[in-house]
Curated annotation (Swiss-Prot):
Assigned keywords, A-Z: DNA-directed RNA polymerase, Nucleotidyltransferase, Transcription, Transferase
One GO molecular-function entry: DNA binding
Catalytic activity: RNA(n) + a ribonucleoside 5'-triphosphate = RNA(n+1) + diphosphate
Subunit note: The RNAP catalytic core consists of 2 alpha, 1 beta, 1 beta' and 1 omega subunit. When a sigma factor is associated with the core the holoenzyme is formed, which can initiate transcription.
Transferase is among the record's keywords: yes
This protein's name: DNA-directed RNA polymerase subunit omega
SUPFAM superfamilies: RPB6/omega subunit-like
Purpose: Promotes RNA polymerase assembly. Latches the N- and C-terminal regions of the beta' subunit thereby facilitating its interaction with the beta and alpha subunits.
Originating species: Clostridium botulinum (strain Eklund 17B / Type B)
Record-listed E.C. numbers: 2.7.7.6
Cellular component GO terms, alphabetical: DNA-directed RNA polymerase complex
Enzyme class, spelled out: transferase
Family under the similarity heading: Belongs to the RNA polymerase subunit omega family.
Gene symbol of the encoding locus: rpoZ
Amino acid sequence: MNNSMINPSIVDLLTKVGDRYSLVILTSKRAREIIEGAEPLTKVDSHKPLTIAINEVNEDIVKYEE
């Protein structure tokens, strides 16, 4: 079994968004935008849309608006 750490951690992400539900909504919507052709707003080593979206949230590039 692989015990790899998720980076950034869920705790760090929740300080930026507030709750898990909002985090899921925000990252999934942003990942969908990237899948549909939107340019990534940050440089990451991954080509996975969800990983890019999570890093954008972590870097405060994409923010949750109520």
